[in-house]
Amino acid sequence: MSKKFSRRKEQREKKKIALERIDILFNLAERVFAYDKELANRYVEIALAVQQKAKVRMPRKWKRRYCKKCHSFLVPGVNARVRLRQKRMPHVVIKCLECGHIMRYPYLREKKERRKAKKQ
């Protein structure tokens, strides 16, 4: 029994370290992007490799900051176009200006949370 619990604890620790590394790499990519886009893209690739190896989910705040197709770090207004659309379901459209890939993220959940906050 003790081995099983220690293994779980070890896996939890590995995932925690992986998430910290992903966060550090994306913060570095954010800082470096202004003067070296290639290095920022490399940091994103390394973060994706860490995420895959550790089998952890990418945090939401970073998931939307890289292109799913070309893995480049996205900065709105520089190499990404961000638009809000209302057709059918309200969503955010992010277009990568490096490869032309379009990503859509619904924001219905955020709207519902705001409505609940207003009612209370």
Swiss-Prot record:
First-listed, main subcellular location of the protein, grouped into a coarse class: cytoplasm
Cofactor needs: Zn(2+)
GO cellular component, one term: cytoplasm
GO biological process: tRNA 5'-leader removal
Top-rank lineage group of the source organism: Archaea
Residues where Zn(2+) binds: 67, 70, 96, 99
Annotated TM spans: none
Subcellular location: Cytoplasm
Record text on cofactor binding: Binds 1 zinc ion per subunit.
Keywords recorded for this protein, A-Z: Cytoplasm, Endonuclease, Hydrolase, Metal-binding, Nuclease, tRNA processing, Zinc
EC annotation from Swiss-Prot or TrEMBL: 3.1.26.5
Cross-referenced InterPro entries: RNP4 (IPR016432), Rpr2/Snm1/Rpp21 (IPR007175)
Enzyme class: hydrolase
Intrachain disulfide bonds: none
UniProt-listed NCBIfam families: PRK03954.1
Its biological purpose: Part of ribonuclease P, a protein complex that generates mature tRNA molecules by cleaving their 5'-ends.
Family: Belongs to the eukaryotic/archaeal RNase P protein component 4 family.
Listed name of the protein: Ribonuclease P protein component 4
Species assigned in the record: Thermococcus sibiricus (strain DSM 12597 / MM 739)
Classification lineage: Archaea, Methanobacteriati, Methanobacteriota, Thermococci, Thermococcales
